[in-house]
Amino acid sequence: SEDWIVLVDECHRTQEKDLGAFLSATLPNARFFGFTGTPIKKADKDTYARFSEPGETYLDKYGIDDAVRDKATVPILYEGRKTDWSINEAEIDILFDRWFVDVPDDKREKLRKKGVSLAVIAKHPGRIRLIALDIWEHFKQVCRPDKYKAQIVAIDRESIVLYRTALRDVVAADLMKDGMAEAEAVAKAGRMIACVFSKSQEDNKPSEDADIADLRAELEAHFLDDEGEKAAKKAFKGGGDEPSFLIVCDKLLTGFDSPNEHVMYLDKPLREHGLL
């Protein structure tokens, strides 16, 4: 019946695959209206083609400028942080040979066999340490004076725990310069950082590979279940500095409302609906 009107929220996510096909087949004559802040236009996923009349795009548009004007959101400002460890995706093999020259031969070959990828390059320990230091120095200048907080977006779950360790060490070293005892500084720095990521079925499995076993142990140590994640997000939105940072890779990138979050440090390519 054409009397049916279907309102689809977050329509870029649900209507291209089975759910959308079943819904259209069930209500073939219904009028569909889609709502999204991040429409997608790709060969295999086209929000405009799914919901718009031929040759049209939006029926109505309420953009970021409108939301800022109405004070529904705040302006988004982008600042590039170029370093010697910036990654050009076209030169991944060259960067691998240059950056991993001091890594033991067996470990370097193991990485090469897995495939030299953007993620492998991004997780170089020296690169992570340098960026963690840059994040902390920037955070002290921009966020800390006004008790603002920040997210760090890493490329994957492994890089989350790598960033946590590097940032904890940087913060602890700074606290020790201010006279705090080492054990207290390390503990305090650890409490200033929370990691939010999804669990994998592989996390609890033993491995004969020492690197994989260590990674799984780190992921297990810093994983937050549903209650732990709720508590971390509540504390993050609160006034204290524990935590001051949320480190994520996929979660909390969109739809997470925290007025005291001032900066999102991006070390992951984000595109289309993953960006806003």
Language-model-derived ranges and their functions:
Residues 246-248, 253-269, 275:
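A short beta-strand element within the Helicase C-terminal
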Residues 1-33:
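SF2 helicase catalytic motif II
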Residues 21-23, 46-53, 93-94, 166-171, ...:
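Short secondary-structure boundary/capping segments
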Residues 2-3, 27-31, 59, 70-76, ...:
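Short glycine-/polar-rich loops that comprise or flank the Walker A/P-loop
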Residues 114-248:
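Conserved C-terminal RecA-like helicase domain
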Residues 12-13, 37-42, 69, 82-86, ...:
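Conserved nucleotide-binding/hydrolysis micro-motifs of P-loop NTPases
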